[in-house]
Amino acid sequence: MAKRLPGNRLRPHVKAHKTSALARLQHDAGHQGFTCATSREVLGLAKAGLGDDLLLANETVDVSRLAAMAATNARVTVAVDSDATIDAAAEAGIRECVIDIRVGFRCGCEVDEAAQLADRARASNIEVRGVMGYEGHAMGVVDLDRRRELVKAAMERLVEAHSLVGGELITGGGTGTHAINTWVNEIQAGSYVLMDTAYTEQTDQPFSQGLFLQSTVVSVAEKFAVCDAGLKAQGMDHGNPSWGDGEILFCSDEHTNLVPDNSVKVGDRISLTPAHIDPTMAKHQVLHLVSKGEVIDRWDIDLRHW
């Protein structure tokens, strides 16, 4: 990705991996700014010395958390889309924001509200760095032509809002639209670094699967087997995980039932591929780095929680 979107053209979203060690590799590859979903991610990156330019791409009215972010040595920018979010940011001592524009079905203000909100922020001594809009409704669309249509419609709204607000940033996008969203000047992709089955269904994606969930076969029946990783071990909002050596039947709280292509026995270790990495990472404490079947390092997933 560093070759596709060098430097500040990419603002990696750490909500995907929640790991400061991995963020450091992204930083070393030339990406000085990061997108964050939670105050914990902002504070964790600041503590790790990766606070060159942190964008909290979510609205919050929690003044105490905003104040904690403002008190770090990091450069912190927050997304705002209402008088209430601007007032909370001002009370907490936040000094920079972007106006979040509703370009789909997420947060954001209407285009015709953007200028008024920018004026309110500036009157509160908050610099408006530009606009943000996340076309999440387009991100997972498999058909490329349809994805292009959705991105175009969404980004036309964002560009119009930017003409009213000003600032150097037009920020948005993600892994699913990183190659086709030519309207923004920085892309907030996150999943690309580990990938999941939801994105690998898009045949135009150049990224390889990097995250696997290790599980153990704990029971074997005549026509199926059961492993010990279920709903509580992985993100399920995008469907079942996949398994390269058989078929997934269903997942329950602590187990996944599967039909193996070849016989398995109790105690066998298997690798599941999660359908959605973000919530999967939030459920675990450690990433094990594996090369040629050997664990070569362990990274704490230290940016979890709120």
Regions found by a protein language model. Name each.
Residues 94-96, 102-205:
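Active-site loop/helix belt of alpha/beta enzymes
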Residues 147, 176-245:
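Active-site loop ensemble at the mouth of alpha/beta enzyme cores that anchors a bound cofactor
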Residues 10-133, 138-140:
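Active-site-proximal beta-alpha core segment in soluble small-molecule metabolic enzymes
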Residues 220-306:
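C-terminal accessory subdomain/extension
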Residues 17, 40, 84, 112, ...:
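Conserved active-site and cofactor/substrate-binding residues in soluble primary-metabolism enzymes
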Residues 39, 59, 136, 175, ...:
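Flexible loop residues that form catalytic
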Residues 1-6, 12, 53-61, 121, ...:
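Alpha-helix-loop-beta-strand connector modules within alpha/beta enzyme cores
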Residues 33, 52-53, 96, 130, ...:
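Residues at the N-termini of beta-strands
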